[in-house]
Amino acid sequence: MRTTQYLLSTLKETPADAEVISHQLMLRAGMIRKLASGLYTWLPTGLRVLKKVENIVREEMNNAGAIEISMPVVQPADLWQESGRWEQYGPELLRLVDRSDRPFVLGPTHEEVITDLIRNELSSYKQLPLNLFQIQTKFRDEVRPRFGVMRSREFIMKDAYSFHTSQGSLQETYDAMYRAYSQSFSRMGLDFRAVQADTGSIGGSASHEFQVLAQSGEDDIVFSTGSDYAANIEMAEALPPAGGRADATQERVQFATPEAKTIADLVEQFTLPIEKTVKTLMVKATKESGHTLVALLVRGDHELNEIKAEKIDIVAAPLTFATEEEIRALVNAGPGSLGPVGLNMPIVADRTVAAMSDFSAGANIDGQHFSGINWQRDLPLPRIADIRNVVEGDASPDGKGTLLIKRGIEVGHIFQLGTKYSEAMKASVQGEDGRNQTLTMGCYGIGITRIVAAAIEQNHDERGIIWSPALAPFQVAILPMNMQKSFRVKELAEALYQQLRAKGIDVILDDRKERPGVMFADMELIGVPHTIVIGERNLDNDEIEYKARRGGEKRLIKTDEIVDFLMAELAQ
């Protein structure tokens, strides 16, 4: 590719609305342009990277035995109503009607469509197992699109779906896809971790996320210092504190706290140890519980894990915090003065709270708190559950070492769905015994567009992007200095360009009438791994300058050795 025949839309300045480095660099490198909130046009440089990601994923899917298909983006609403996700999915599901007032959705995922296809195409266990995938545009109506293509409304995703007649068969495919994902991300040069994860609105039993480690990540990833345990913070179990609960040493005392609206206020104003305070959070209860609200107790310095709390049978899903009006109707106090003593509703205490003594909490009277609260003396022990996020230093759930927490960007997610969709949509085949058998399913997603952003978050410097060789839009850049004024510079640049193209190398020849500084800056910005500079002075010594993007190594190479040298570098 020649720059004079290419749309190289680089920017010198960082756009003001770009928050994270990947968004900034994708705009500056001319990879994307914003059309509307959460919607982006992919320019040639960005599309070249995107296609390389797609090709790696496609190759690994083929190697894992998956078969490619293509399904419609627009899906009939009745399939979502049949699966039960029409209401469950929420406002992220973009709903629309056609000219005949028939309801449709823009697909964020394709579980319903693939299940409908399979129930009409398969009839016998002999046709299974089957693993189908597609690489296609998806749409989620994000309430606040942000971070460029990291959290956009329209995005490209690889989604695969497998069908089985046994859990054992599903496990085999799940393991194969786990390996395929690991191989894909390794080939892309990403520093990633596979972690245990929650199944979310997709549903099912087992699930793993593939997280690219980056400070800008939105997810907290938990690791053990003493084993290979890794999990999303939503799933990481917080073990009960070691040792028993200490005996009471204080009497319960009520004291005025008119200015303390939060735990932070309470700790600051009364110099209380935060680990001796308890937060009382009220959420909606299920109808079956016979109650309106449930009180959840966590230690003052801990955070409620909403995913864990939502799984408690008396807590309504999705988890919804009570409004101040709803709280006052039952307690006659505001959220800043709530506590467990005398509370007339179901209470669920975190394991850590259940092990506390002499703690402080609200008195359920505005502007009043208790100190010196003790279980069994001042109130009975409530229901106990793990409902908090782990923190660094907690014991690892597998009993080996302690926990560390890092930030991650989710780029892949695999699920063992079981029979959630096949039962709801009556997808079955004739089993080996002649009876109808409900299909067991797995689903497997990779965020193609998100991978591009995640790779940049991990690989950049002050000059721009540093692509791995597998993802770079171009592998080699040829920069001829003043080629319009030097016949031998132009002749060698053209010859080298043709030689590299003949060897199948993605090469860009910068044949613009630009200053050398501009040419260098652009190639560093878009992240070309290998740059060769052809200038009159070095040609006097029959040499060409080579520069590596990663590490910045510079070397002078003999002109008749440069092709072999580059091929050796590209083979590494």
From Swiss-Prot:
The keyword Ligase applies. GO terms for molecular function: aminoacyl-tRNA deacylase activity; ATP binding; proline-tRNA ligase activity. InterPro entries: aa-tRNA-synt_IIb, aa-tRNA-synth_II, aa-tRNA-synth_II/BPL/LPL, Anticodon-bd, Anticodon-bd_dom_sf, Pro-tRNA-ligase_IIa, Pro-tRNA-synth_IIa_bac-type, Pro-tRNA-Synthase_IIa_type1. Catalyzes the attachment of proline to tRNA(Pro) in a two-step reaction: proline is first activated by ATP to form Pro-AMP and then transferred to the acceptor end of tRNA(Pro). As ProRS can inadvertently accommodate and process non-cognate amino acids such as alanine and cysteine, to avoid such errors it has two additional distinct editing activities against alanine. One activity is designated as 'pretransfer' editing and involves the tRNA(Pro)-independent hydrolysis of activated Ala-AMP. Its main location: cytoplasm. Homodimer. Keywords: Aminoacyl-tRNA synthetase, ATP-binding, Cytoplasm, Ligase, Nucleotide-binding, Protein biosynthesis. PANTHER family: MITOCHONDRIAL RIBOSOME PROTEIN L39/PROLYL-TRNA LIGASE FAMILY MEMBER, PROLINE--TRNA LIGASE. It is found in: Cytoplasm. This is Proline--tRNA ligase. It comes from Erwinia tasmaniensis (strain DSM 17950 / CFBP 7177 / CIP 109463 / NCPPB 4357 / Et1/99). Its EC number is 6.1.1.15. It comes from the Bacteria. GO terms for cellular component: cytosol. Consists of three domains: the N-terminal catalytic domain, the editing domain and the C-terminal anticodon-binding domain. Belongs to the class-II aminoacyl-tRNA synthetase family. ProS type 1 subfamily. Gene3D superfamilies: Anticodon-binding domain, Bira Bifunctional Protein, Domain 2, YbaK/aminoacyl-tRNA synthetase-associated domain. PROSITE patterns: AA_TRNA_LIGASE_II. HAMAP family: Pro_tRNA_synth_type1. It is an enzyme of class 6 (ligase). The gene is proS. GO terms for biological process: prolyl-tRNA aminoacylation. It catalyses: tRNA(Pro) + L-proline + ATP = L-prolyl-tRNA(Pro) + AMP + diphosphate.
